Amino acid sequence: MTPRGRFITLEGVDGAGKSTHTAWMVQALRDLGLTVLATREPGGTPVGEKLRELLLSEPMALETETLLMFAARCEHVREVIAPALARGEWVVCDRFTDASYAYQGGGRQLGAARVAALEQWVHPDLQPDRTWLFDVPLDVARARLARSRQLDRFEREEDAFFERTRAAYHERARSSDGRIRIIDSSRPLEVVRAQLDSEVRELVAQAA
């Protein structure tokens, strides 16, 4: 029987540097001899990518936004994530359900209970094995976004939205029993990478 793979997620508010480290982590795991699938949310499937376009560009009701996030996630879990894990692959995902707790539950003030109900429906038996939460103060995140591409609908939100989102992420980390590791990504890139390298190697050794 093929051993189950491991499921890694990367989280953080927009501008925290999360996506910068995703490709590096995928390559680091491959360099350790692992078969790795890189994916993202919303997205990861043809249906999910179409929903991503809507979610990042079109104004919509909070409830619609939340349900579309989980619709994309449902397709993603069933068609991509679960099959890859069953094949023994390691999956590295740029955002997962912690993002819904943070952005919709916290930023949009939907609350955790409704997000939890959808989580229980869509993937009751799947949780990441390890989540790295890239964390920066709001002013650092804003400065990074200002230097990037044209901003999407979420990235254009007001400061209060991002403060609530960041606070919700921290609450998730506190209640995660160590699954979520917070990375201070306001530090120099090489310092962050050194910490990640150590923690990735630790995770791989534990899985051996």
From Swiss-Prot:
Keywords linked to the UniProt accession: ATP-binding, Kinase, Nucleotide biosynthesis, Nucleotide-binding, Transferase
InterPro entries, per the entry: P-loop_NTPase, Thymidylate_kin-like_dom, Thymidylate_kinase
Main EC class the enzyme belongs to: transferase
One BP annotation, GO: dTDP biosynthetic process
GO MF entries: ATP binding; dTMP kinase activity
One protein family per Pfam: Thymidylate_kin
Transmembrane segments: none
CC terms in the record's Gene Ontology section: cytosol
The reaction(s) this protein catalyses: dTMP + ATP = dTDP + ADP
EC number, UniProt record: 2.7.4.9
Residue sites binding ATP per the record: G12, V13, D14, G15, A16, G17, K18, S19
Disulfide bonding pattern of the chain: none
Function: Phosphorylation of dTMP to form dTDP in both de novo and salvage pathways of dTTP synthesis.
Family stated for the protein in its record: Belongs to the thymidylate kinase family.
PANTHER family: THYMIDYLATE KINASE (PTHR10344), UMP-CMP KINASE 2, MITOCHONDRIAL (PTHR10344:SF4)
NCBIfam families linked to this entry: DTMP_kinase
Protein name, as recorded: Thymidylate kinase
Record organism: Bordetella pertussis (strain Tohama I / ATCC BAA-589 / NCTC 13251)
Gene it is expressed from: tmk
